[in-house]
Each structure stands twice: as C-alpha cells, then as structure tokens.
Curated annotation (Swiss-Prot):
Belongs to the glycosyl hydrolase 72 family. It comes from Aspergillus fumigatus (strain ATCC MYA-4609 / CBS 101355 / FGSC A1100 / Af293) (Neosartorya fumigata). Residues 1-21 form the signal peptide. Residues 452-475 form a propeptide. Residues 429-446 have a biased composition (Low complexity). It is found in: Cell membrane. GO terms for biological process: fungal-type cell wall (1->3)-beta-D-glucan biosynthetic process; fungal-type cell wall organization. It is a lipid-anchor; GPI-anchor. This is 1,3-beta-glucanosyltransferase gel2. (1,3-beta-D-glucosyl)n 1 binds at Y87, N159, Y294. Keywords: Cell membrane, Disulfide bond, Glycoprotein, GPI-anchor, Lipoprotein, Membrane, Signal, Transferase. The active site is at E160 (proton donor), E262 (nucleophile). Splits internally a 1,3-beta-glucan molecule and transfers the newly generated reducing end (the donor) to the non-reducing end of another 1,3-beta-glucan molecule (the acceptor) forming a 1,3-beta linkage, resulting in the elongation of 1,3-beta-glucan chains in the cell wall. Involved in cell wall morphogenesis.
Amino acid sequence: MLPTYVRLFTAVCALATTASAVVPIEVKGKDFVNSKTGDRFQILGVDYQPGGSSGFTKDKDPLSDPDACLRDAALMQRLGVNTIRIYNLSPSLNHDECASIFNAAGIYMILDVNSPLYGGYLDRTDPESTYNDVYFKQVFGVIEAFKNFPNTLAFFAGNEVINEQSVKNVPTYVRAIQRDMKDYIAKNLDRSIPVGYSAADIRPILMDTLNYFMCADDANSQSDFFGLNSYSWCGNSSYTKSGYDVLTKDFADASIPVFFSEYGCNEVQPRYFSEVQALYGQEMTQSFSGGLVYEYTQEENDYGLVQINDNGTVTLLVDYDNLMAQYSKLDMSRIQASNTTQTSAKPPKCESSLITNSTFTDSFDLPKRPSKVQTMIDKGLSDANTGKLVEVKNTDIKQKIYNANGEEITGIKLSILASGESNTPGAHSSGSTSGSSSSGGSSSSSSDKESAAGTISVPFVGLLSAASFMAFFML
C-alpha cells in the first residue's frame, strides 16, 4: 500500500485539473485588479468569433464546441493572451467545457450579452420597441450561463449601438440596460461582475460618450468600464501620427478602466502590431488597461491571426507570429504594478454640463423598467441554463496545426495553470516544427516558475502548493 503522503499528493494533483486557474477580476477606480493580490490586471486579448456573426446560430456559438475551444485555447495560450471577447452567445447551449478550458488556460472572458437574432438586441433606430422581456431573456440568460465561472471578467451591455444611424435617446436605453443588468447581478449572483459599453471611435462625440456612461447616478446605471473600438494605428505608425497621444490625454482623467475592445488596423499587411509597445508603454498605461486585437480567426474582412481550415486544422498566419513577438517584449511586472492614485479615482456626478455636443443627449432620465423584467430580477430567470465549472480531462489537441510556411507544428497542448495564475506571454510556448528543437512543453522564467508553484485549492487544508502539501505529510 502506498504511503499516506503519496496518496494525498496524488489526490492533490488530480484536483489540479478542476482547481480554479484564475481568480475573479474586480474594478477599483480606473483599474482592473486581481481580487486576491491587488495587482493591476492589463488586458492582453483577442476578439473571438469564429465564422463571424453569420456563423452564429441558436444551435452553435464560439463556446459550444469543446474540441475547437481546446485547440484555440492552446494556441491563444501560446500566443500570450489572457483575455478573449465573444460577441454572440446562445444562452440555451452548454458552455461548461469551453469556459472551463479557457479558465484552465488562464484566459478570462469578456462577453457581449446581445445577439444578432430576433429579440436579441436593442434596435438603435427604435430602442423602445426592443426594450422588453423578450430581449432580457437573452441578456439575463447570458449572465446566468457564465456567472459561475471565475474567468468571466465582464459583460458588454452594447457594442457600437451609438453611431450615425442611432436616434438621440439610445444612450438612455443603454444606461437602462446597464442598470437592469447590475440589479440582476446584485440580486442573483454570488459576486459582482463588471458591466460596461463598447464604443465606436467617433471623435466628435467620443468624450461625450465616455462622460455619459462614466458618471454616477442614484440608479447605479453607470458603466463599470469603457471599451473603445479603434483602428487609428496602421502599419508602422507612431504614438503621435496615430493619434494615440490624443487618446491618452483624453482618457487620462477617466474614473473607470478604459481599454481597446477592438484594435489592429489591416490597411498594411501583414500587420506589424507595433502599437502594442505604445499601448502597454509608460504613457498609455496611465490611461488604458490594455486591449483586444481584432480578431482571432480569418474571416471575409481579412483581420485574422489564424486560418481555420474546412477540416478543422489551423494555419497560423504571419499576423499571429508578429503579435506573439510584440507580446514577448512586454515588461509584465511593470504593466501589472498597482497604482493607488488610479484605484482611488471617483466618477463625476451625472449633469447635463458633462455633454458638449448638441447631437448627443444630455438627459439622464432613464426609461422605466418593464414589469416582467422586474419579476425576472426579483425571482431570477425561471428557465435559466446556469453554467458550472467542470473538470478539464484532456489537454492534447486533435487537430493539426501549421505555421505560415505550411509546416506542421507538433506538440502543441494546453497547459493547465496553477490556482491563481493567469496566462502571460512566453510562459507556455508549446510546439515545434519538424527539424527544430523544442521541449514541446511550457517554458518559464524564474519569476514565472515561482508564480506557477502557486496554490491549489484544497477544501480541508486551505491554500497550499502541491510541493508544500507533500512536504508537510513527509514530516
């Protein structure tokens, strides 16, 4: 019979497959922070919508195919990202395996609650007609589906709803949706999950949009964060030529986290992603909390980092390699350092004087909540398909992976991270091409290894590293 300490150590290792790889992220002032360590969290991410909006149906979404999720999570882990954004989700589908896979990979999820299907979005030309209980079954359904995953970072209440085609009162409806989502979360969730808005880069109204959603009111309808879809840096531009210096100045006084919810101009190809060094540099990190590159998969609009082939195999494009190279240059210790000045930022009070453009509403009178929506909030969604964290049993991907030259890359697999650890560039770079040397596993710096030793959640002994746990029972 095996000694007790060996059996217990084996049990701890088994638990590692279901242990929470990440800890929830919170908003403090203008920063995202790790809820356990207090370290600042900077988004290094990609937008993830394989097939685009046309590939989404009520029976299939980006987080409903575990084999595809395992493949993509391993490739994203290798790339160095710590966050993905998903635009369209079907609440009725089972997302447990996919969400758990990304959790194990140390990758957070920012989720849009809308869908392009009938009843799943706010009509920007007639918002009153779609602000109803049918719409909120979609919204609250997404919240229910992902509320139990520690890697659910945030929810987007809207994406570019305010544009040239929208009517003037649309912002009041978006704030009302945020109010309703935050009330549902407060009433029906065990933790607070941030809610925010993703804006188009329309410069004449950009600061009005920020101020409108950032300011505080009695209804608790303000955004917890602000996303910006911006493509002003093209090719080997610069901090000043791209206008990034202007954006940095404009958002310097923001009281909530601001990040690029989309970036990566494709006018010059392949993309160099030289803006990564500016975005995570000394100047911009005072105003921005990182960003999400548009986008992971190659679609008709030609923004992809990878090409998913018809047989499920994947070809890594030059853009993938270029982005990975840019990520590898980042000083993560500086990027993640906490700043008490930023975490203590307070929002302004909502007043009409915050709005300067006459085309943008200065009214903060929100539409009344429909009675059926109030019932959903009070009692919870009656037919909720509530998700749960599950064991990640397999880390080997089934599909073949090819580099930009068409050579097969072997040995790519998912690394299940230690409890409390999120993915960082260069820490999990599995895979090698024929004739090249590679361990096929993960490589870490000394500081990464210290972090990876981490802790494993063991219900009856608290938080102990696996090595410490074994050593304890060897005494």
